[in-house]
């Protein structure tokens, strides 16, 4: 059965996308279509936004104060294009490369539309993502931007924690969150058992939507939850990578969605990120990694491996070599995983060894070096991994170890997928000025 066949469908007339170019041109945005290129295909363009401030979005004073407190001055490309549309209540399907602040788009847009005095015991916003760590991070983003909205309550729900605590929280009007953040499995269980009621939901958001809708189990959970929500609501979906097939799946959940693609699909490059590869034998990886960590200047570094076993072993080896390392993978208990993620984010450790569980959406501002100790198996996974460095327009460095013919094939696929050439890392290294912000 295809993705489309088992999803809620709307009539063909309702699924007419409006595509907005990412060029900051309000008139073009109102026209709703990206200009076609010579081949007749509609594409967006990548243009930096420096003149517009968050105040121009006419956000609530409480949100503007929170934005100022966070130190943000100018919206990124994706924020500039998407926030004005999202706060009007339009359904939104947005693809934008890693590090451009997609989370802030739906956080600000939904908070802007909330009542000043939200009704106690009623959930009006639901945000789902595919990992517990990302759910935890999104919850924190809501708390950060809602700091001057004292009546707003945010709750996070995910598997691996006692469901009794969730039920207790939801059973009391005084503690029941207005904003529900979580993973599909736990949210669906709470909805199915009638502990969480979504009859008054106004906003339905999926972050890293392709990851959830591409996995049958998660997709089934998402659909079951969707059926428990009102027909009239705002639906927003975000990801750094959206294939044409997944776009079609996403739009099955939407009515007349506004499609926003910041940068066209062939240019999902990360501006400011220096990318290299190192060709070596498998047995040479540890020595080369040691050399890089000794010689590179970095704030924090994330190292990706292919399995939980390799993650544990490499973390142990690094600590034996006196490198301040921690490991994050699915084999670690939930509470310990959150604890390690928090410690890394708070700069208590400078090196994190991880599987792909850390490869999507997780935002640690100080990471400026990403190393693929093991190459990913797909080009899109590469984008999400190296996107951990050079977040939000800052500089960064990625180095990928290529040790087999399969690795070489993936490297070639990455270069073809993103129309980019990744050079070999110079034997004498590179200047830290090329990947370190002043």
From Swiss-Prot:
Low complexity: bias regions: 21-38
Task performed by this protein: ATP-binding RNA helicase involved in transcription elongation and required for the export of mRNA out of the nucleus. SUB2 also plays a role in pre-mRNA splicing and spliceosome assembly. May be involved in rDNA and telomeric silencing, and maintenance of genome integrity.
GO cellular component assignments: chromosome, telomeric region; spliceosomal complex; transcription export complex
Any one Pfam family match given in the protein's UniProt record, by short name: Helicase_C
PROSITE patterns from the UniProt entry: HELICASE_ATP_BIND_1 (PS51192), HELICASE_CTER (PS51194), Q_MOTIF (PS51195)
Major place of residence: nucleus
Keyword list, A-Z: ATP-binding, Helicase, Hydrolase, mRNA processing, mRNA splicing, mRNA transport, Nucleotide-binding, Nucleus, RNA-binding, Spliceosome, Transport
SMART domains referenced in this protein's UniProt entry, alphabetically: DEXDc, HELICc
Organism of origin: Phaeosphaeria nodorum (strain SN15 / ATCC MYA-4574 / FGSC 10173)
Gene Ontology terms: biological process: mRNA 3'-end processing; mRNA export from nucleus; mRNA splicing, via spliceosome; subtelomeric heterochromatin formation; transcription elongation by RNA polymerase II; transcription-coupled nucleotide-excision repair
Presence of keyword DNA damage: no
Residue positions of motif DEAD box: 207-210
Record protein name field: ATP-dependent RNA helicase SUB2
Homology family: Belongs to the DEAD box helicase family. DECD subfamily.
Tagged with keyword ATP-binding: yes
Location of the region described as Disordered in the Swiss-Prot/TrEMBL record: 1-41
Free-text note regarding domains: The Q motif is unique to and characteristic of the DEAD box family of RNA helicases and controls ATP binding and hydrolysis.
E.C. numbers: 3.6.4.13
Cellular compartments annotated: Nucleus
Residues in Helicase ATP-binding domain copies: 83-260
Domain Helicase C-terminal: 288-433
């Amino acid at each position: 059965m295809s993705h489309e066949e088992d999803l809620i469908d709307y009539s063909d007339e309702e699924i007419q996308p409006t595509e907005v170019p990412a060029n900051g041109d309000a008139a073009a945005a109102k026209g709703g279509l990206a200009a076609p290129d010579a081949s007749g295909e509609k594409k967006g363009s990548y243009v930096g936004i420096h003149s517009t401030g968050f105040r121009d979005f006419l956000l609530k004073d409480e949100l503007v104060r929170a934005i100022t407190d966070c130190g943000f001055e100018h919206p990124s490309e994706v924020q500039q294009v998407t926030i004005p549309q999202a706060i009007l209540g339009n359904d939104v399907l947005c693809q934008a490369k890693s590090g451009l602040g997609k989370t802030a788009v739906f956080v600000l847009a939904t908070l802007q539309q909330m009542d000043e005095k939200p009704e106690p015991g009623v959930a009006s916003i639901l945000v789902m993502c595919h990992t517990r760590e990302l759910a935890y991070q999104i919850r924190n983003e809501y708390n950060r931007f809602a700091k001057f909205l004292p009546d707003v309550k945010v709750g996070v729900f995910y598997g691996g924690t006692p469901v009794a605590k969730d039920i207790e929280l939801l059973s009391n009007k005084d503690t029941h969150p207005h904003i529900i953040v979580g993973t599909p499995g736990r949210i669906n269980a709470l909805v199915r058992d009638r502990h969480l009621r979504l009859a008054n939901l106004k906003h339905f958001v999926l972050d890293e939507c392709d990851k959830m809708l591409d996995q049958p189990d998660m997709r089934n959970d998402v659909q079951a939850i969707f059926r428990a929500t009102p027909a009239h609501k705002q639906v927003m979906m975000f990801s750094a990578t959206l294939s044409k097939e997944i776009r079609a799946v996403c739009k099955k959940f939407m009515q007349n969605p506004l499609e926003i693609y910041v940068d066209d699909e062939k240019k999902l490059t990360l501006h400011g990120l220096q990318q290299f590869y190192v060709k070596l034998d498998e047995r040479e990886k540890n020595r080369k990694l040691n050399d890089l960590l000794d010689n590179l200047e970095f704030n924090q570094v994330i190292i990706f491996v292919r399995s939980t076993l390799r993650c544990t072993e490499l973390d142990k080896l690094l600590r034996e070599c006196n490198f301040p390392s921690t490991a994050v993978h699915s084999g670690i208990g939930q509470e310990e995983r959150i604890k390690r993620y928090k410690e890394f984010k708070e700069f208590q450790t400078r090196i994190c060894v991880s599987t792909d569980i850390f490869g999507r959406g997780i935002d640690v501002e100080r990471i400026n070096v990403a190393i693929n100790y093991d190459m990913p198996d797909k080009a899109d996974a590469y984008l999400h991994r190296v996107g951990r460095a050079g977040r939000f327009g800052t500089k960064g460095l990625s180095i990928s170890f290529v040790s087999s013919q399969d690795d070489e094939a993936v490297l070639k696929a990455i270069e073809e997928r993103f129309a980019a050439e990744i050079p070999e890392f110079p034997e004498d290294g590179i200047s830290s000025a090329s990947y370190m912000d002043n």
